[in-house]
Regions:
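Active-site glycine- and acidic-residue-rich loops that bind
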Residues: 141-143, 248-251
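Glycine-rich beta-strand-to-loop/alpha-helix junction loops that act as flexible
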Residues: 223-224, 244-250, 268-270
Length: 285
């Protein structure tokens, strides 16, 4: 995962680009009917139960739009919320509140949905050693927020992008001429370029597991699209040589049994690509 400083930089970029996209040369609806001296107050209202996420993001958005806006936070990121709860109040320039409204809601609704789903998955893993991981199957331009939401929901972050970890998947292996060649070429490249990156290698069957184990320097083996029986066999083969990760269509119905196979991690793209926004609204008071 990237550093906290890099993550903050990504979030700032998301905010700047989203405001550019949404506001453009001006919010003419507000400019047309609301005086620039008008002051107002609004509440962020919960309309669906779940795990709230994006409160810190909302504060950043309000500050970016207008540093004079005052935000009173009543409920923090990661808390369980129910219908009727008020997460925060924002007060100040009415025009500024309206300018920030859509980005705040878009971000918080999406982040809260992801945090809620992640939390449900973590509950299913209780009593096992497995931890839930996200993937790169994120909304383009929104990745930092979605990965933050996974953490808020109790999950762990996989690599952020293509540059903070090496992950040799099926196509890399096939293009490189096989597992052993792909691993050796990767280790040579990292040594020659002075890059200190962990290496994950995907295995499609037990034979590939055995071949991966012949090479040193692999941080984690991705056990991809294995059934339960073969996953257990893979975990036994790997032992303490490196960490293990199950992936491939794992959902609420199957995650517990995969965890009980003894893997260290389970990665699921569904955390970020198959969620429905949590219903939130910003209402004038």
């Amino acid at each position: 995962m990237i550093s906290e400083a890099k993550l903050n930089e990504e979030v700032e970029g998301i905010i700047a680009n989203a405001i550019r996209e949404d506001v453009g040369p001006g919010d003419y609806s507000s400019l047309a009917c609301i005086p620039d001296t008008a002051q107002g107050k609004a509440k962020l209202l919960v309309k669906e139960k779940g795990i709230i996420a994006g409160v810190a993001f909302a504060q950043k958005v309000f500050a970016y739009v207008d540093e004079a806006l005052e935000v009173e936070v009543l409920i923090q990121d990661g808390a369980e919320v129910k219908v009727g709860d008020i997460v925060l109040y924002v007060s100040g320039s009415s025009q500024s509140i309206l300018k920030a409204e859509r980005l705040v809601l878009n971000g918080m609704q999406r982040m809260s949905a992801i945090a809620t789903k992640t939390n449900a998955y973590t509950q299913l893993l209780q009593g096992t050693k497995a931890k839930i991981l996200d993937t790169r199957k994120t909304t383009p331009g929104f990745r930092a927020l979605e990965k933050m939401a996974v953490k808020i929901g109790g999950g762990e972050n996989h690599r952020f992008a293509l540059y903070d970890m090496v992950m040799l998947k099926d196509n890399h292996i096939d293009f490189a001429g096989g597992i052993t060649k792909a691993i050796e070429k990767t280790k040579n490249y990292l040594k020659e370029t002075g890059r200190d990156l962990k290496i994950i290698v995907e295995a499609r069957d037990l034979g590939e597991i055995k071949e991966i184990l012949l090479s040193e320097g692999v941080y984690r083996i991705l056990i991809d699209n294995f059934n339960y029986e073969d996953t257990r066999k893979a975990v036994q083969l790997i032992g303490d040589t490196c960490l293990t990760e199950s992936s491939g269509g794992i959902n609420e119905k199957t995650i517990r049994e995969y965890a009980e196979c003894g893997v260290d991690f389970i990665s699921s793209g569904a955390l970020t690509h198959s969620v429905y926004n949590l219903d939130l609204s910003l209402k004038a008071v």
